[in-house]
């Protein structure tokens, strides 16, 4: 229980803590986010103490009722912090003592803040992962719905930011949706590793008082129990894994945002953002800026920084708990808030995006069919390397003459290869071009529809 100084650890100390150190050491400004899960963990632990014979039933009921009152005050915004509340655990225990008296001093029996805080963090992150998983599935579902509705729209596909081949607009959407399905799978796997109970591990050596950890696990609905008390209280690999998941997901979202920023410029004019996800200029009245997408792109760097920062904190720590681990929570809270906002904004952008079909169509050009010209020769029996060279010669001839590739006459093409014949005219049909790529995963309509079914099946399988 807290000493006269209000500290949970004050018994062996003489004199006051330097006020600067007091502020430096305090984490209540941000770990107050854990108030609800801290109460949940304490309620479960009180039941464990009662089963172990360390609390009477009356004492347990007194503690449970007091904790309910603490939670009620937090929920209603009436909980008052004191200057000595250095963290959420101190604050809740101090208030519990004010409400129920000395019985509150038994709650911490055999428990350390080391196993308490990591239990709180795992509980909080488990809830947050569920929320993020739901938001990510909504975004992916929105993208798939759009891909299905606009699967007949063709536009240029790019490599090296140069026009490459005609593809379906839906194929582009699905390329990003499929990447996000892997992020969705990864998040569920991270959540499984978060969902492991450390409570009952004490500070380092374990619990000597017969507390039933299986009871604690069941009370808090954890999937498993940590295997080693030293590892349980000091390891933050689950935090690092969550931050890496967020970094990778933000990488995918940032790349999609970059594409849409480019496609929305006057130079491309393929898409137009809704006013709801754009802003203007304080000087230039004509401007409509894609701030939503630019912020998604920029916040990726913020998330990366949090991930790298935590790894740097962890890499040099000696075994078991060190105060350095206090740095984990700000990273988790900030990244969680960022991801929630980004996923919601990205869903809004995709659901309200306007596409300019005619501009997409006009951007298609015959030179993008040079690969198809090579495939034409392959189907006539020419080895691909020779066909590639022949198509390249046709491109060079067209550029030299200053004409489009499809305007070369049959006679001119036959000077490159006698395998060219009248049916080469089919090569210049963009719809015919995309339909060639019918192998699973390609841009043909049948393949795009197969992709849509596959992604929807993945989403359904991930529903809780």
Curated annotation (Swiss-Prot):
Family: Belongs to the lyase 1 family. Argininosuccinate lyase subfamily.
Cross-referenced HAMAP family: Arg_succ_lyase (MF_00006)
Binding site residues for 2-(N(omega)-L-arginino)succinate: 27, 114, 159, 289, 321, 326, 329
Subunit structure: Homotetramer. Forms tissue-specific complexes with ASS1, SLC7A1, HSP90AA1 and nitric oxide synthase NOS1, NOS2 or NOS3; the complex maintenance is independent of ASL catalytic function.
Catalytic reaction(s) noted: 2-(N(omega)-L-arginino)succinate = fumarate + L-arginine
Location of N-acetylalanine modifications: 2
Protein name: Argininosuccinate lyase
Post-translation changes: Acetylation modifies enzyme activity in response to alterations of extracellular nutrient availability. Acetylation increased with trichostin A (TSA) or with nicotinamide (NAM). Glucose increases acetylation by about a factor of 3 with decreasing enzyme activity. Acetylation on Lys-288 is decreased on the addition of extra amino acids resulting in activation of enzyme activity.
Organism: Mus musculus (Mouse)
Regulation: Enzyme activity is regulated by acetylation.
Pathway where this protein functions: Amino-acid biosynthesis; L-arginine biosynthesis; L-arginine from L-ornithine and carbamoyl phosphate: step 3/3; Nitrogen metabolism; urea cycle; L-arginine and fumarate from (N(omega)-L-arginino)succinate: step 1/1
Signal peptide start and end residues: none
Keyword hit for Thylakoid: no
Residue numbers bearing the N6-acetyllysine modification: 7, 69, 288
Function noted in UniProt: Catalyzes the reversible cleavage of L-argininosuccinate to fumarate and L-arginine, an intermediate step reaction in the urea cycle mostly providing for hepatic nitrogen detoxification into excretable urea as well as de novo L-arginine synthesis in nonhepatic tissues. Essential regulator of intracellular and extracellular L-arginine pools.
Active site: 160, 281
Originating gene: Asl
Any one GO BP annotation for this protein: locomotory behavior
Site (Increases basicity of active site His): 294
Keyword terms, alphabetized: Acetylation, Amino-acid biosynthesis, Arginine biosynthesis, Lyase, Urea cycle
GO molecular function: argininosuccinate lyase activity; identical protein binding
Free-text tissue specificity from the UniProt record: Expressed in lung and brain (at protein level).
EC number in record: 4.3.2.1
InterPro entries: Arg_succ_lyase_C (IPR029419), Argininosuccinate_lyase (IPR009049), Fumarase/histidase_N (IPR024083), Fumarate_lyase_CS (IPR020557), Fumarate_lyase_fam (IPR000362), Fumarate_lyase_N (IPR022761), L-Aspartase-like (IPR008948)
């Amino acid at each position: 229980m807290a000493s006269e100084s209000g500290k949970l650890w004050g018994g062996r100390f003489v004199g006051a803590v330097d006020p600067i150190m007091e502020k430096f050491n305090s984490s209540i400004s941000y770990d107050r986010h854990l108030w609800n899960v801290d109460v949940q963990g304490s309620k479960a632990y009180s039941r464990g103490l009662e089963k172990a014979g360390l609390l009477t039933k009356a004492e347990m009921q007194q503690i449970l009722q007091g904790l309910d009152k603490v939670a009620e005050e937090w929920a209603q915004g009436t909980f008052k912090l004191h200057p000595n509340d250095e963290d959420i655990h101190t604050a809740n225990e101090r208030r519990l003592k004010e409400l129920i008296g000395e019985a509150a001093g038994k709650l911490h029996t055999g428990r350390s803040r080391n196993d308490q805080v990591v239990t709180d963090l795992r509980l909080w992150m488990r809830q947050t992962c569920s929320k993020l998983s739901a938001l990510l599935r909504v975004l992916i579902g929105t993208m798939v719905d759009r891909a299905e509705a606009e699967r007949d729209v063709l536009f240029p596909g790019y490599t090296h930011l140069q026009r490459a081949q005609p593809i379906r607009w839906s194929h582009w959407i699905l390329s990003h949706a499929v990447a996000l399905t892997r992020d969705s799978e990864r998040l569920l796997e991270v959540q499984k590793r978060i969902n492991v109970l450390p409570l009952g591990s004490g500070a380092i050596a374990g619990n000597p008082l017969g507390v039933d950890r299986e009871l604690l696990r069941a009370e808090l609905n954890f999937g498993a129990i940590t295997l080693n008390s030293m590892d349980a209280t000091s390891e933050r690999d689950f935090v690092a894994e969550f931050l890496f998941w967020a970094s990778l997901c933000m990488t995918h979202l940032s790349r999609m945002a970059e594409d849409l920023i480019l496609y929305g410029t006057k130079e491309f004019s393929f898409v137009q953002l809704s006013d709801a996800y754009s802003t203007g200029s304080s000087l230039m009245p004509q401007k409509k800026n894609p701030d939503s997408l630019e912020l998604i792109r920029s916040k990726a760097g913020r998330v990366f920084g949090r991930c790298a920062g935590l790894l740097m904190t962890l890499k040099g720590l000696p075994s078991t708990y060190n105060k350095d681990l206090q740095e984990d929570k700000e990273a988790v809270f900030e990244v969680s808030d960022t991801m929630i906002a980004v996923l919601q904004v990205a869903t809004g952008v995709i659901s309200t995006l306007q596409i300019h079909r005619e501009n997409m169509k006009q951007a298609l050009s015959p030179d993008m069919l040079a690969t198809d010209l090579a495939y034409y020769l392959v189907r006539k029996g020419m080895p691909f390397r020779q066909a590639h060279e022949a198509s390249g010669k046709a491109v060079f001839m067209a550029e030299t003459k200053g004409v489009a590739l499809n305007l070369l006459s049959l006679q001119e093409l036959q000077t490159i290869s006698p395998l060219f014949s009248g049916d080469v005219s089919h090569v210049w049909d963009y719809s015919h071009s995309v339909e060639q790529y019918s192998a699973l995963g390609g841009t043909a309509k049948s393949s795009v529809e197969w992709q849509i079914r596959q992604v929807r099946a993945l989403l359904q399988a991930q529903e809780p």
